[in-house]
From Swiss-Prot:
Its main location: cytoplasm. Its EC number is 2.3.1.256. The gene is naa30. The keyword Ribonucleoprotein does not apply. Keywords: Acyltransferase, Cytoplasm, Nucleus, Transferase. This is N-alpha-acetyltransferase 30. It comes from Schizosaccharomyces pombe (strain 972 / ATCC 24843). The keyword Nucleus applies.
Length: 150
């Protein structure tokens, strides 16, 4: 049975391994720690019984001195568990916390050629906001997506 639980330090190694394998951007362990040590309440993991199968890493802080902004930094699901709604449940858990804590907007970036991610976030209500040229280390452009919570 798949459950969504709040981030706990015991999952940091699993998160690092999954994201390094699945996402194109090479993050150091310090990037993960930056998010989960300062804003652990916004990150969640998915478990199948006790097996780690996915995570969403997020934060929320003041943007440009005026706007309380949530940010989805990373989302990854173990390959054989994709297509089962787990990413939606993880993301929704983070969105709910951000909304409850007063987020005025929630943003994320994804590669311009990642059709699956763009479709996923659009289904959750995100709108394409702008193109970020050569955003990723590999030179790929990104689209920034934004959601204005109700």
């Amino acid at each position: 049975m798949v459950t969504i639980v709040p981030y706990s330090h015991q999952y940091l190694k699993d998160i690092c391994q999954l994201i390094q394998k699945d996402l194109s951007e090479p993050y150091s362990k310090y990037v993960y720690r930056y998010f989960v040590h300062q804003w652990p309440e916004f990150s969640f993991v998915a478990l199948d019984n006790d097996r780690f199968i996915g995570a969403v890493i997020c934060k929320q802080d003041v943007h440009r001195g005026t706007t309380l902004r949530g940010y989805i930094a990373m989302l990854a699901i173990v390959k054989e568990y994709r297509g089962q709604g787990i990413a939606t449940k993880l993301t929704q858990a983070s969105l709910d916390v951000m909304k409850n804590r007063g987020a005025q907007e929630i943003v994320l970036e994804t590669e311009v050629d990642n059709e699956a991610a763009m479709s996923f976030y659009e289904r959750l209500g995100f709108c394409r906001y702008k193109r970020l040229y050569r955003y990723y280390l590999n030179g790929t452009d990104a689209f920034r997506y934004i959601l204005y919570p109700n």
